[in-house]
UniProtKB/Swiss-Prot annotation:
It is a multi-pass membrane protein. It comes from Homo sapiens. PANTHER family: MAJOR FACILITATOR SUPERFAMILY DOMAIN-CONTAINING PROTEIN 6-LIKE. One of its GO terms (cellular component) is membrane. This is Major facilitator superfamily domain-containing protein 6-like. InterPro entries: MFS_assoc_dom, MFS_MFSD6, MFS_trans_sf. CDD domains: MFS_MFSD6L (cd17479). It is found in: Membrane. Its main location: membrane. Keywords: Membrane, Transmembrane, Transmembrane helix. Residues 133-160 are annotated as: Disordered.
């Protein structure tokens, strides 16, 4: 069986590297910043978690189905082109989703300072009008001073004369029957004394009573102020607007993921089979570096463009539309490259029950069961970082350029760490690598919970590279040692797709509600404790499991065996005799 006669191996690898590079740039344009954009739409943490959980769930189970159905050359080519072409339009659907509050305040494009309500309070939309601090306050009646508490700004204790807006969960605010007073707040920032109290921001609130319209909506103000327990207040936003934004966002994200999820797996399967026909699969293993390089360049490039083009392209709606426009442009470039992507014409026969067999292999080995459980847990915890870390950084004053740079540091760290893979595997073993990865991830989460400045996230990103790479190195080594012949890729896809993806989905669903009920700092501290407890349990169980000894027949057969001597000394050095004696002694 020969490879596609129109392709030589060097040209095929060149196109594959370019495709991975462009796809990395494409993914980096939107994926790290999607939850930040959803927050700017006015969606609270539970709804953002639900959206991301749905996205991960579709990716975990829809991609293998499409890869199973697309086996022929024509189907794979059509799926690659259709996925990229459809994702161009699907990504632009997110730009059309209206925010919960269309009258919300945006950051001004003229360089002056401003405040966005959804940027200040995760899970809360405060429809307030921000006015300049230099305005004369004499023309505003009923003026009094109030303090708005935001994450990252500490409220000084003992000042009972100031009102603090807490637990403003818009999506849970019940409508109050009867007469109500609707107030429009004009907030004037008071910046005096910020040197002594840098975490305290005081606003002058001017309340003007407005007549109440039927249904409880005041003119020009979408929020109704209703009393809650203590001094907490809730703004009763239109549930219809919230429901509309959430449903449109859910539909757009789900449709978008249905189109994009199969792309990576189908492309990888096609390239691997193409190289397998010419016995060049060893060159397939280095292609992941090009995707990470593309993501590193893309995440820095798109954040630089956002600051320059966002105000030029946007007149209304939330910031961040440049991410989706950039994604569409790079997807078009990837579409052009995909036309030349190597796909074998001759179909390689593979049993259709590989996934089921891979699952049975995992279920029959206690070491793989522990590794699968660890992968699910890590996926759940990593999803909380991916979903809400940028929220945490935003609350501490970080811009998107700093956020992109933090992602690039982590990705470049993974590339620089790769040459040490063999050394770490030899020194630490698979269990040691898992322990190293879990420890680094726990320390990383604990550090995130105590962020203090806009730049403070950058030094810890090296641990992100170690924690991510260490886990997948351990998975790869376990698959290589314990998998039966020609089941390595199926087992690896099971860990990366089903187990890790299911964990990300579960973590997204749960994480949003934890953020709503407590805070991001509490979420990260709880995840840190969970990781340390699981690490202790993992090490205690691992010691009690029988020590497996698998003969790597594929490696043994590749060794050059000298048969020039039939002496007893030659027999003692024979690799097959050694392997049989080791197996018999165990």
């Amino acid at each position: 069986m020969s490879a596609n006669p129109r392709w030589d191996i060097s040209r095929a690898l060149g196109v594959a590297k370019l495709f991975h590079l462009v796809c990395g740039v494409r993914e980096a344009c939107v994926t790290p910043f999607l939850t930040l954009y959803l927050r700017q739409l006015g969606l609270a943490a539970p709804w953002v978690g639900t959206l991301m959980g749905t996205k991960h769930l579709i990716a975990a189970f829809w991609a293998p189905v499409c890869a199973f159905l697309a086996k022929s050359y024509r189907k794979r080519r059509a799926l690659l082109i259709g996925s990229l072409l459809g994702s161009v339009g699907a990504s632009l659907l997110m730009v059309l989703v209206p925010p919960v509050d269309k009258n919300r305040v945006h950051f001004p494009c003229n360089g002056s300072s401003g405040l966005t309500s959804t940027d200040a309070l995760p899970g809360v939309t405060l429809p307030v009008n921000i006015t300049s601090a230099q305005e004369s306050a004499s023309s505003h009646p009923a003026k009094r001073t109030a303090e708005v508490e935001m994450p990252g700004f500490r409220n000084p204790p003992g000042e009972s004369d100031r009102e603090t807006f807490r637990d403003l969960h818009v999506y849970l605010a019940p409508s109050v029957e009867g007469a109500r007073t609707t107030s429009q707040a004009l907030l004037h920032p008071v910046t005096s004394g910020l040197k002594d109290h840098p975490w305290e921001v005081t606003f002058e609130v001017v309340k003007t009573a407005l007549p109440l319209l039927p249904g409880g909506k005041g003119p020009g103000n979408p929020a109704n102020l209703s009393g809650t327990k203590g001094k907490a207040w809730a703004f009763d936003l239109s549930l219809e607007a919230l429901r509309r934004t959430f449903i449109l966002s859910l539909g757009s994200v789900a449709f978008w993921e249905l189109l994009t999820a199969p792309l990576e797996q189908v492309a990888d399967d096609s390239l691997y089979e193409f190289l397998d026909f010419v016995d060049a699969t060893d060159r397939y293993r280095s292609l992941w570096v090009w995707r990470l390089l593309g993501m590193s360049a893309g995440v820095c490039g798109i954040t630089a463009l956002v600051g320059q083009l966002d105000c030029f392209l946007m007149t209304s709606g939330p910031r961040g539309v440049v991410h989706f426009y950039g994604y569409s442009v790079v997807s078009t470039l990837a579409l052009l490259v995909s036309i030349a992507f190597p796909i074998p014409i001759c179909q390689q026969w593979e049993p259709s029950y590989k996934r089921v067999k891979a699952l049975s292999i995992v279920g029959g080995d206690p070491h793989l069961i522990l590794l699968a459980s660890t992968t699910v847990l890590v996926g759940a915890i990593v999803s909380t970082v991916q979903n809400f870390l940028f929220w945490h950084m935003k609350d501490h004053g970080s811009g998107e350029l700093v956020m992109g740079f933090s992602v690039a540091l982590s990705l470049l760290g993974e590339i620089l760490l790769h040459p040490f893979k063999a050394t770490l595997l030899r020194k630490l073993s698979r269990t040691g690598l898992v322990g190293l990865g879990l420890s680094c991830l726990a320390g990383q989460l604990l550090y995130y919970s105590f962020l203090w400045s806009w730049w403070s996230v950058l030094p810890i990103q090296i641990l992100s590279a170690i924690s991510n790479r260490a886990l997948w190195w351990a998975v790869g080594a376990s698959v290589e040692d314990l998998a039966t012949p020609r089941m390595e890729r199926a087992l690896s896809a099971l860990f990366r797709g089903h187990f890790y993806g299911s964990g990300c989905s579960l973590g997204s669903f749960v994480g949003g509600f934890v953020v709503m009920r407590f805070s991001l700092a509490v979420l990260y501290q709880a995840c840190c404790v969970a990781l340390l407890l699981w690490l202790a349990l993992l090490l205690s169980i691992q010691r009690r499991l029988p020590r497996e000894r698998k003969i790597k027949y594929s490696k043994l057969l590749s060794m050059e065996v000298s048969d020039t001597s039939d002496s007893e000394q030659g027999t003692e050095q024979d690799w097959l005799v050694k392997a049989m004696r080791e197996e018999h002694s165990d």
